[in-house]
Amino acid sequence: MKITWLGHAAFRLDFAGTAVLIDPFLTHNPVFKGDVAEVSKGVSHILLTHGHSDHIGDTAGIVKAAEAEGRKVIVVANPEVCGFLSGQGLSAFEPMNTGGTVKLDGFSVTMVRADHSSGGDGSNPTYLGNPNGLIVKAAGEPTLWHLGDTDLFSDMALISEIHQPKVAIVPIGDRFTMGPETAALAVRRFISAETVVPCHYGTFPLLVPDASGFVAALQGHSAKVVVPNSGESFEV
């Protein structure tokens, strides 16, 4: 599996001839320096953890650009987010919710708990369902857990026990999610992954600017901490 960090909580996964995007907040993401068309090339699915604009991001634009090329990109999200995006002209969805699993073309996605909120922006925000983390599984590939936006909770241990993730993508930015020390505690205490990737930091002034505190808090822990630059890929 090749994992590419696109800044904030956005990632591209390439595995077994499949390419998916998670939370593709790109155009208005100051950390993303790439080209939206390039990073979405060949993508078959977009997986969304929740309905905040810094996670839905470029979903509608990517799907419509693919349709103009004769390709279909399917959005995997909770029903409320699917409904919201249908109002933007999208029609190809795999709706699901917390605890459920959807089997797709050569891989599966399971939604798991995240402690956060989920709604549209503005003075009268739209309710967009519950936030979630995502478990991505494919035969012969390491299981990946994108935690979404969340605080620490002890049932992370149960999620680890059930799904046995080898890779965990963990928010560390503080204020809106766990901060570095709490995220490191989650990894030490509850998350069994062999490889840990921090995200949701350095995007805006309100967030922790870098991953150094997270890395320091995990010194001596068995998990490998990978801190890619925006646009950088690594393989697991």
From Swiss-Prot:
Origin superkingdom: Bacteria
Name listed for the protein in its UniProt record: UPF0173 metal-dependent hydrolase AZC_2841
Transmembrane annotation, as ranges: none
Organism: Azorhizobium caulinodans (strain ATCC 43989 / DSM 5975 / JCM 20966 / LMG 6465 / NBRC 14845 / NCIMB 13405 / ORS 571)
Molecular function terms from GO: hydrolase activity
Keyword set, alphabetical order: Hydrolase
Family from the record: Belongs to the UPF0173 family.
